[in-house]
């Protein structure tokens, strides 16, 4: 039986073959579900997550209030950049994880850039 592979999954695999993160310049990867947004900085060499932020995290839950999904994505980007700065991370490689660079994905990236991360 053939496996069903979506175009997003194909795009994701193609992108992941080309980019990887290191400790000095980790990979900023995002995932979005219908309701939540997740972002993390990954060191692919060591196979470790350095920083992780999501709309489900306790720190952001109280801050979000009645934000729409795009507004919540901006808060995730800001919180991720703040946590990265605290760990001494200035530059990242952006991995949109096969999602279109539009809407919530763009909001996370823009907020992280405004907060000081360099892509």
Curated annotation (Swiss-Prot):
GO terms for cellular component: cytosolic large ribosomal subunit. Keywords: Ribonucleoprotein, Ribosomal protein, RNA-binding, rRNA-binding. Signal peptide: none annotated. Transmembrane segments: none annotated. GO terms for molecular function: 5S rRNA binding; structural constituent of ribosome. One of its GO terms (biological process) is translation. Gene3D superfamilies: 3.30.420.100. The keyword Transcription regulation does not apply. It comes from the Bacteria. This is one of the proteins that bind and probably mediate the attachment of the 5S RNA into the large ribosomal subunit, where it forms part of the central protuberance. Part of the 50S ribosomal subunit; part of the 5S rRNA/L5/L18/L25 subcomplex. Contacts the 5S and 23S rRNAs. Belongs to the universal ribosomal protein uL18 family. This is Large ribosomal subunit protein uL18. It comes from Anaeromyxobacter dehalogenans (strain 2CP-C). The gene is rplR.
